[in-house]
Amino acid sequence: MNVLIVEDEKSLALEMDEFLSNEGFIIEHAWKKASAEEKIFVNSYDFILLDLGLPDGDGFEVLKQLKSLKDRDDAVIILTARSAVDDRIKGLDEGADDYLPKPFSLNELLARMHAIIRRKHKLEKNEVDIHGFLLNIQNRTVSFADERLNLTKKEFEIFNYLVLNKNRVVSRMSLTEHVWGDILEVNSDSNFVDVHVKNLRKKLSAVNPTDWFETVRSIGYRINC
């Protein structure tokens, strides 16, 4: 999953970067309001961690621009030193998914991100059962019959993203963007994603049939449940 950190306090931004990268997230940074608005206009993100006190403007303006874009469901967590209740209410009213006052624990941030994933995809817990495969979002593991599969980080991310979007066709471009980040930085070979999906499907099929894992010709993939 990809995350845009909009935070001008570089030490905090880099701490979040290191912590979330170790948890498997793909990180991008925007240090100012202008660069944040430019990025969200071009790319979509699974999460936007948004500071309100930016050097060239208010983070609320970034939130407003995001919400004005069509067909976007980027989850927004506001991170700010502002403690006023009015600011919290304003952020939530304008479409933020959560509000975390500074200073905060990185583990709490991660827990809130997991909670948003559960709400967004209507999950009761961090585990999802897909045709006998148990995907654990928090531990980033996939197992079958109590045996853990040896998936690479990217294979897990692909499976995770497809599972969270089950019964929907996920395009190759969308999959690339959410697993590898900025699509412009990814190998332009059209077979790039297909190779990773082929390896993932091979590992899944080795323990159980995967006729539910569909390739939608010329578009992408779909997991049917």
Features from the language model and the residues they span:
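A short, glycine- and basic residue-enriched loop/turn
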Residues: 82-84, 107, 125-127, 141, ...
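Short boundary/linker motifs that mark transitions into or out of structured domains
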Residues: 129-141, 219
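Positively charged, aromatic-enriched patches within helix-turn-helix-type DNA-binding elements
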Residues: 141, 146-211, 217
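Nucleotide second-messenger and two-component phosphorelay signaling modules
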Residues: 71, 121-125, 185, 208-210
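N-terminal/domain-start alpha-helical segments
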Residues: 1-120
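Conserved active-site beta-strand element of glycosyltransferases/polysaccharide synthases
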Residues: 221-224
